[in-house]
């Protein structure tokens, strides 16, 4: 399953930057070589060992556990026997360990706890290097103004305040630390996962690898079909990015899809099972309160969140309050002993433009703010999930209310889709909203693929969704004034104006596609040095004419 990195990203090499506080830190970055290899720029890389051609990966063994020593050296964890899970051995990960890590006392082992106690962890230095390295540019035509350096101390302060998170379960030591917060690069998430209708373990593992190679910062496994536990194990053991899940899906699977048979004990066992596997963040739909359900009655599309609909159905069947809400402190107690991050789910998000910014949506958001306070009291890391389907003129209100209710906890939104009329193109309708909401301060954007509302995404859909959202996140970073975003735009525009076609391809988000589109009309090698393309031809190229004007003036 090794992908040819040199084909996808020509003229790129993997490079590692060492830490200074912790000298055993090695942060992987991608260097793009340009100007006939005389210059280069450094870019953020999410692929881990999957984008290092020097590393041989055996997916049956998983990838290197780069954080294991950092975790053990803190001396606040101990090994426990993993709870037994009935899995189909035919599909099980072959090297599944029976030992897991957990806090050795009642003290939290979260990045927030360390940050609040003035401890800079290796994870904090790691993300500071990742965020800051892009600003260290060796191009001669660099911008004159650079923003202040992102230091490990700044990272610590942001995490202590709750404005940023590092999802990093101690049982996922393979993950390369990354940070989600409005004062950092805008991140993107890719959803994968099987259904009862389609897909296999191999398919989902391949989707994960493609997603991170093209730039997904986190991946959510939303499997609802067969072999949920096994799929997740394969993904986690081979993933260098944080993995998120919606545990209520597997809990419902355990009761054969009968919502009324769910209870907190089943959910709790599922939570611990996934915590022991190494899931880095959980979507918990604890804000769907019984009294809020009636507010969805007049909606055009009702409740469109799967988790939200499950919990609303359960509340209605039993005429009781949401057990995720009533047992929230106990959930916090589990999370803090593994350092699992809350992704507080928007179970009442709007599923159509007609339902955007309604009472149900904002009642739930207010409750998520109250739950954030409770989680922070336990030193648990938190991000807040957001919509959904929102027209452009209503997007800003979502961010303003989230900041107010949730006290600047990172916002994580699904798009939002800005119109409902384009099935098959919802990666575009949503990337428009994602760019806008990212500009307003959303920290992570959950991708939408062309298959949204139509079916289970395949590998090409995953790639298309990731690229669309890398564009949205990058556009938001530009609008926010992030210098690392500006650098790459500047370099590509320089290459374009000077007809350096290979540099233009290689600096793009998808070099393979850029080159293939150019090759459709001008496939010859000579065309790669021509001062025109097939759009204008040699006589009408505005940039060529501009060069001629300059030569006359000189």
Swiss-Prot record:
GO terms for cellular component: cytosol. Zn(2+) binds at residues 389, 453. [4Fe-4S] cluster binds at residues 533, 536, 541. InterPro entries: ThiC, ThiC-associated_dom, ThiC/Bza_core_dom, ThiC/BzaA/B. GO terms for molecular function: 4 iron, 4 sulfur cluster binding; carbon-carbon lyase activity; zinc ion binding. Its EC number is 4.1.99.17. It comes from the Bacteria. Its cofactor is [4Fe-4S] cluster. Disulfide bonds: none annotated. NCBIfam families: PRK09284.1, PRK13352.1, thiC. This is Phosphomethylpyrimidine synthase. It comes from Ehrlichia chaffeensis (strain ATCC CRL-10679 / Arkansas). The lineage of its organism: Bacteria, Pseudomonadati, Pseudomonadota, Alphaproteobacteria, Rickettsiales.
């Amino acid at each position: 399953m090794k992908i040819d990195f040199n084909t996808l990203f020509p003229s790129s090499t993997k490079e590692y930057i060492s830490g200074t506080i912790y000298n055993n830190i090695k942060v992987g970055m991608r260097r793009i070589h340009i100007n006939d290899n005389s210059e280069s720029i450094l870019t953020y890389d999410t692929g881990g060992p999957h984008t290092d051609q020097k590393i041989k990966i055996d997916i049956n063994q998983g990838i290197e556990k780069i954080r294991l020593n950092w975790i053990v050296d803190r001396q606040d964890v101990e090994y426990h026997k993993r709870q037994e899970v009935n899995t189909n051995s035919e599909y099980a990960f072959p090297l599944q360990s029976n030992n897991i890590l957990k806090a050795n006392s009642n003290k939290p082992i979260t990045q927030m706890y360390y940050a609040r106690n003035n401890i800079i962890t290796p994870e904090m230095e790691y993300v500071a290097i990742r965020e800051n390295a892009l600003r260290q540019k060796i191009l001669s035509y660099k911008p004159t103004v650079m923003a202040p350096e992102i230091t490990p101390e700044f990272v610590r302060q942001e995490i202590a305040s709750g404005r940023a998170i590092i999802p990093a379960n101690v049982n996922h030591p393979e993950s390369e630390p990354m940070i989600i917060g409005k004062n950092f690069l805008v991140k993107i998430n890719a959803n994968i996962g099987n259904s009862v209708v389609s897909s296999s373990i191999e398919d989902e593992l391949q989707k994960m690898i493609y997603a991170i190679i093209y730039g997904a910062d986190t991946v959510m496994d939303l499997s609802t079909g067969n072999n949920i536990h096994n799929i997740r194990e394969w993904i986690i053991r081979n993933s260098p990015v944080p993995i998120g899940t919606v545990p209520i899906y597997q809990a419902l699977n355990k009761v054969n899809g009968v919502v009324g048979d769910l209870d907190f004990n089943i959910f709790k066992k599922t939570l611990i099972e996934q915590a022991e596997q190494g899931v880095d963040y959980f979507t918990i739909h604890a804000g769907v309160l019984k009294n809020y359900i009636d507010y969805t009655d007049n909606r055009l599309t009702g409740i469109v969140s799967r988790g939200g609909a499950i919990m609303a159905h359960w509340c209605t069947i039993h005429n009781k309050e949401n057990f995720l809400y009533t047992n929230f402190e106990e959930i916090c107690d589990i999370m803090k002993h593994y350092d699992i991050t809350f992704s507080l789910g928007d179970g009442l998000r709007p599923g159509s433009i007609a339902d955007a910014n309604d009472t149900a949506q904002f009642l739930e958001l207010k409750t998520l703010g109250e739950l954030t306070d409770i989680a922070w009291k336990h030193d648990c890391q938190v991000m807040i999930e957001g919509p959904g389907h929102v027209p452009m003129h209503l997007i800003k209100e979502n961010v303003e209310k989230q900041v107010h209710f949730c006290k600047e906890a990172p916002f994580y939104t699904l798009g939002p889709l800005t119109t409902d009329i384009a099935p098959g193109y919802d990666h575009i309708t949503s990337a428009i909203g994602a760019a806008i909401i990212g500009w307003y301060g959303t920290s992570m954007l959950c991708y939408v693929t062309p298959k949204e509302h139509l079916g289970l995404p395949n590998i090409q859909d995953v790639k298309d969704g990731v690229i669309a959202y890398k564009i949205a996140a990058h556009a938001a970073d530009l609008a926010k004034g992030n210098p690392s975003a500006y650098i790459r735009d500047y370099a590509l525009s320089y290459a374009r104006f000077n007809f350096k076609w290979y540099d233009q391809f290689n600096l793009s988000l998808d070099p393979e596609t850029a080159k293939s589109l150019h090759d459709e009309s001008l496939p010859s090698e000579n065309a790669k040095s021509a001062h025109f393309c097939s759009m204008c031809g040699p006589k009408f190229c505005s940039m060529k004419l501009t060069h001629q004007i300059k030569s006359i003036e000189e």
